[in-house]
């Protein structure tokens, strides 16, 4: 349904139990129907599934995403004037196998508690909350242990040093000022480019680069 601005029918009854990829399924569309009953337990790729969709705001917090490895740009908006409005409770998602979360909430208005997410496998956080003016939740307990030099390959692609994988994470995230000073960032010796530029994040609340408190 990518680029289909008119489709908004009830498809809640679809059998999605064998689907492995929902890459851009509702991107650039106005789809906004309840699909909370979908079985997405085998879906590995949610890349930009709802990206650039400024209508979707349905409860999908009960989805079983335990097979997911790619959440890149899942709720990404287009720009500052066209942000996505998705703001449902997804705190219960099983993110233990996710490798990529880049741009997941970029240009979005998402502001829900995701502090208990298992981020221990995530290797790419680039621009995750960039230009999100709303997000200000406690994620100080996130496990960044996969952000190491030895994990530079993600799905066969080389994303370079760990520092590059956090570039612009909170860029222009104007509300964010949670304490993330406890993040273990041993392999990131200096602040990543544009990490929190134009955000509300104070120096005291930033990670202590090159350390593991």
Task: Describe every region a protein language model picked out.
Residues 1-213:
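Negatively charged
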């Amino acid at each position: 349904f990518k680029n289909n601005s008119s489709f908004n029918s009830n498809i809640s009854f679809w059998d999605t139990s064998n689907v492995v990829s929902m890459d851009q399924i509702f991107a650039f569309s106005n789809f906004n129907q309840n699909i909370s009953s979908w079985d997405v337990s085998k879906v590995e790729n949610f890349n930009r599934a709802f990206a650039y969709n400024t209508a979707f705001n349905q409860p999908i917090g009960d989805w079983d995403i335990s097979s997911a490895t790619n959440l890149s740009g899942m709720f990404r908006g287009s720009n500052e004037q066209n942000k996505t409005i998705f703001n449902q409770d997804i705190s219960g998602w099983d993110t233990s196998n996710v490798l990529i979360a880049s741009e997941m909430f970029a240009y979005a208005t998402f502001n829900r508690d995701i502090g208990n997410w298992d981020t221990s496998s995530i290797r790419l956080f680039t621009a995750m909350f960039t230009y999100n003016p709303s997000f200000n939740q406690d994620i100080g307990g996130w496990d960044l242990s996969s952000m190491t030099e030895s994990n530079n390959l993600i799905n066969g692609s080389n994303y370079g040093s760990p520092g590059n994988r956090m570039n612009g994470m909170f860029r222009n995230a104007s509300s964010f000022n949670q304490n993330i000073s406890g993040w273990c960032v041993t392999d990131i010796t200096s602040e990543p480019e544009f990490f929190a530029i134009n955000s509300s994040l104070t120096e005291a609340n930033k990670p202590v680069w090159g350390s593991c408190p």
